[in-house]
Structure formats: structure tokens, C-alpha cells
Curated annotation (Swiss-Prot):
This is Chalcone--flavanone isomerase. Catalyzes the intramolecular cyclization of bicyclic chalcones into tricyclic (S)-flavanones. Responsible for the isomerization of 4,2',4',6'-tetrahydroxychalcone (also termed chalcone) into naringenin. InterPro entries: CFI, Chalcone_isomerase, Chalcone_isomerase_3-sand, Chalcone_isomerase_bundle_sf, Chalcone_isomerase_sf. Its EC number is 5.5.1.6. It catalyses: a chalcone = a flavanone. It comes from Pueraria montana var. lobata (Kudzu vine). Pathway: Secondary metabolite biosynthesis; flavonoid biosynthesis. Substrate binds at residues 53, 118, 195.
């Protein structure tokens, strides 16, 4: 009798009309990443929840062994309530690629203003905001100045363990060959992901997705 095929631990995620593939390769970094989780980001306006962005967090394969050491065997219900789990994703010694694709049109200035406000508020709250971070935030703002996001357009954030934040922009979901800006500031880089999945997360949906998907990967490895 033939052995049963291994059950996939990684699959694509659909957020509105946006599909987040299970695995992507970045021509900018030459690395391949698996989809940790994806979810929507929105705001309640006049009593109605409006979805603006779909966010996907992709992780380098070495994230599995790094996270499994502490979190393997933990159920989703526990992980989703555990801030340290998300902080270990944010600060872990592996590369991340965050994809933010627009559901509604948004100017780069509007989008980046909110991201920067959240990042600065977090850094000030934990005491990591100084002159170097202020300069890095200015560079972040400059990168978005001439960008206008139509539905489906995307910003990619590449985060390296040594604190480099690479930004690239696409009119669709194609990862560009070259990055539009590179910001070398560990506190700012970490703050971008912290504001998405940390204590005051802009996407609780993304947090739930990470907590529901990663236990299988940590227990059985990456199976596509």
C-alpha cells in the first residue's frame, strides 16, 4: 500500500481579490520565502468597516527552526493571545518579506503618513526613537512621495536580521528586481512589523492568520 502524501502545511491565502501565494522568490534579494500569514487592514468609518489593504508576512525558511525552539506544539488559541510569539517573529534572526497590497486606491503620502505615525509612537513608547530614527523616518517618507497606489498595487518591505529595511513598489503583485530605497535602521525596521502584528496591531486579522497557520509548519516543516 502506497504511503499517503504529506499534507501541505503552507497554502495560499485570499484577501478580497488579492491572492498571497504560498511561496515567493524575490529577485531583489535572491531569497525564497514562505507565507506565514495574511490578512486585511481597515478602519471603521462612520460605523462601517472599510478594508484598505491586504498584508502578507513571508518568512525565510530558517524561521521554522528559530520559532520551533520555543513555540512548537503550542495551539493557535494560545499563540494568538501571546505577544512574545509575535515579538519573536518581529525580532527573529531570519529575513522577512512583507507585502502590502491595496484594496482601495491610496496615495503614497497618505499611506506612509499613517505608517510613520504608528512607528514613531511605538519607538517613543519603548525608548528607541532618537536622531538616527528621525532621519530614517524622513528617508521612509521620501520613498513614498511620488507613489500612488491603485487597487492591487503593492509595497514590499524586506527586513534583514541586521536591521536593513528595503522598500520596493509594484503596480501589481510582482516583486521588483531592484529596491526603491534601503533604510539602515534596526529600530525603524522592527517598528514597521511591530505596528502590524505587535501589541497595538493594525491588522488583528493578520495576527490570527499567523497563529492559525504556523503551528503546522513548526511541527511538520514547510510542505507545499
Amino acid at each position: 500500500m502506497a504511503a499517503a502524501a504529506a499534507v501541505a502545511t503552507i497554502s495560499a491565502v485570499q484577501v478580497e481579490f488579492l491572492e498571497f501565494p504560498a511561496v515567493v522568490t524575490s529577485p531583489a534579494s535572491g531569497r525564497t520565502y514562505f507565507l506565514g500569514g495574511a490578512g486585511e487592514r481597515g478602519l471603521t468609518i462612520e460605523g462601517k468597516f472599510i478594508k484598505f489593504t491586504g498584508i502578507g508576512v513571508y518568512l525565510e525558511d530558517k524561521a521554522v527552526s528559530s520559532l520551533a525552539a520555543k513555540w512548537k506544539g503550542k495551539p493557535s488559541e494560545e499563540l494568538v493571545e501571546t505577544l512574545d510569539f509575535y515579538r519573536d517573529i518581529i525580532s527573529g534572526p531570519f529575513e522577512k518579506l512583507i507585502r502590502g497590497s491595496k484594496i482601495l486606491p491610496l496615495s503614497g503620502v497618505e499611506y506612509s503618513k499613517k505608517v510613520m505615525e504608528n512607528c514613531v509612537a511605538h519607538m517613543k513608547s519603548v525608548g528607541t526613537y532618537g536622531d538616527a530614527e528621525a532621519a530614517a523616518i524622513e528617508k521612509f517618507a521620501e520613498a513614498f512621495k511620488n507613489v500612488n497606489f491603485q487597487p492591487g498595487a503593492t509595497v514590499f518591505y524586506r527586513q534583514s536580521p541586521d536591521g536593513v529595511l528595503g522598500l520596493s513598489f509594484s503596480e501589481d503583485v510582482t516583486i521588483p528586481d531592484n529596491e526603491a530605497a534601503v533604510i539602515e535602521n534596526k529600530a525603524v525596521s522592527a517598528a514597521v512589523l511591530e505596528t502590524m502584528i505587535g501589541e497595538h496591531a493594525v491588522s488583528p486579522d493578520l495576527k490570527r492568520s499567523l497563529a492559525s497557520r504556523l503551528p503546522a509548519v513548526l511541527s511538520h516543516g514547510i510542505i507545499v
